[in-house]
UniProtKB/Swiss-Prot annotation:
The gene is glpK. One of its GO terms (biological process) is glycerol metabolic process. Keywords: ATP-binding, Glycerol metabolism, Kinase, Nucleotide-binding, Transferase. Its EC number is 2.7.1.30. NCBIfam families: glycerol_kin (TIGR01311), PRK00047.1 (NF000756). Key enzyme in the regulation of glycerol uptake and metabolism. Catalyzes the phosphorylation of glycerol to yield sn-glycerol 3-phosphate. It comes from Polaromonas sp. (strain JS666 / ATCC BAA-500). ATP binds at T11, S12, S13, T264, G307, Q311, G412. This is Glycerol kinase. It holds the Pfam family FGGY_C.
Length: 497
């Protein structure tokens, strides 16, 4: 049996998973990652703690699997995207804490770019909207606000990277300063049409080109780990940002295939093939994980409050003691009794982009119970995802592509059968839950397996993908459309006059 190791560095934890060549999990390990909140709206991580926890889980996973590093054919890395690290090339020490993707400190820079009328330029090159979410403005903040850093950067003494770059630098002892196209595409500095750092965008934000890592395909021979770290050198063969890695792990290799990750929020990606498409529905264009030097693209949208609405039921309303109780409570009534919840706790993301929206619960009567509210809360996740998917389908159809035929799902909340069935009903297409739901880590393992010869092609990987359960729609198209109309009416009520 051949084995692959996936390093899955996330926002709240570092994880490592050993897979066999059939895509089965052999062993896994996880360590929590402390969050640092220096000011309201600021979120940081300690880069050395990221490295320490990731290395520790890799060692633990190998130990649990009863394997040595020499038994591992290759290693893949997947990571929280956009989070920004700058370090000294000579020592490998960071100059500051990592600025996490959720951090909003660069909003003033983004406002200036909008005032300068740079939105069309940036979207045409990067596929992104101007937002503090992306790495470029975080990097500018570090250059402008950490004493001495700009001068050091201009002398070529510093390196920038997203978390994948940082881990590869540490794994190789500084021999490798690289990233993959999917992570590069989230910086707002990378031209996704040419697959290169964009000189005009670097100049716009005042970023020296010497800071930037080499960009490689997501499946490639990156280098090897230092032998002393794990007991033997392991080839680094695959790298992708978490959402693109999940798309790959779901075997969504062809245009029109899509996945939705149901976590605290929801992340939906649709593969759009080799043609760059600009969304007319408020979605992002991003690089998909690439196995060759030729660009491949995906359309992306995110729901801010997905599974977090269940946490609110528990912690805010005290309607449930634990998140696992929500399905039974919601199933204790046949429907929501006319109750509609729009959980716009932090505004609404794609496709609405209403930052000033606030959460609402409508349709309450004397007969409304906590079970109706729980059901409406669960259904809100499906409504938001359906609105996002319908926007993606409109973009696909307008560019001459076929609408989506099925949706593949992953993430913690996809275990909720009630939610998945309602999602299929709203969309009118099958919803497929995979046998292996650790699709983010699996994607990294697949990418490493391709470059190291474990797999011959993505066709072989497609043949390995298995659904654990398929949810078929049980509602007619007219009934589903009526429900979506009620949802859109509720969304319009979230912005106060």
């Amino acid at each position: 049996m051949t084995y692959l190791l996936a390093l899955d560095q996330g926002t709240s934890s570092s994880r490592s998973i050993v897979f066999d060549e059939l895509g089965h999990i052999v062993a896994q390990a996880q360590q929590e990652l402390p969050q640092i909140y220096p000011k309201p709206g600021w979120v940081e991580h300690d880069p050395m703690e990221i490295w320490r926890t990731q290395l520790a889980t890799a060692r633990e996973a190998l130990g649990k699997a009863g394997l040595k590093a020499s038994d591992i054919r290759a290693l893949g890395i997947t990571n929280q995207r956009e989070t920004t690290v700058v370090w000294h090339r000579a020592t490998g020490q960071p100059i500051h804490n990592a600025i996490v993707w959720q951090d909003r400190r660069a909003e003033a820079t983004c406002a200036q770019l909008r005032e300068q009328g740079k939105e069309a330029l940036i979207q045409s090159k990067t596929g992104l909207l101007i937002d503090a979410y992306f790495s470029g403005t975080k990097l500018k903040w570090l250059l402008d606000n950490v004493p001495g850093v700009r001068a050091q950067a201009e002398r070529g003494e510093l390196a920038f990277g997203t978390i994948d770059s940082w881990l590869m630098w540490q794994l190789t002892g500084g021999a490798l300063h690289a990233t993959d196209v999917s992570n590069a595409s989230r910086t707002m500095l990378f031209n996704v049409r040419t697959n290169q750092w964009d000189a005009e965008l670097l100049d716009l934000l005042g970023i020296p080109a010497s800071l930037m890592p080499q960009v490689l395909p997501s499946s490639a021979h990156y280098g090897e780990t230092r032998p002393e770290l794990l007991g033997h050198a392991i080839a680094i063969g695959g790298v992708a940002g978490d959402q693109q890695s999940a798309l790959f792990g779901q075997a969504c290799f062809k245009a029109g295939m899509a996945k939705n990750t149901y976590g605290t929020g929801c992340f939906m990606l649709m593969h759009t093939g080799t043609q760059f498409q600009t969304s007319h529905n408020g979605l992002l264009t991003t690089s998909a994980a690439q196995t060759t030097a030729h660009p491949e693209f995906a359309m992306e949208g995110s729901v801010f409050v997905g599974g977090a609405v269940v946490q609110w039921l528990r912690d805010g309303l005290h309607a449930i003691q634990g998140s696992g109780e929500v399905q039974a409570l919601a199933q204790s009534v046949p429907d929501s009794g006319g109750v509609m919840m729009v959980p716009a706790f932090t505004g609404l993301g794609a496709p609405y982009w209403k930052p000033d929206a606030r959460g609402t619960i409508t349709g309450l009567t004397r007969g409304t119970t906590v079970a109706h509210i729980a059901r409406a809360a669960l259904e809100s996740i499906a409504y938001q995802s359906a609105a996002l998917l319908q926007a993606m389908s409109r973009d696909a159809v307008s560019s001459g592509a076929a609408p989506l035929a099925e949706l593949r799902v992953d993430g913690g909340a996809c275990a909720n059968d009630l939610l998945m069935q309602f999602q299929a009903d709203l969309l009118g297409i099958p919803v497929l839950r995979p046998a292996v739901i650790e699709t983010t880590a699996l994607g990294a393992a697949y990418l490493a397996g391709l470059s190291s010869g474990v797999y011959r092609s993505t066709d072989e990987l497609s043949g390995m993908w298995r659904a654990e359960r398929t949810f078929l729609p049980t509602l007619g198209a007219d009934s589903a459309a009526a429900l979506m109309n009620r949802w859109e009416h509720a969304v319009r009520q979230t912005v106060l006059p």
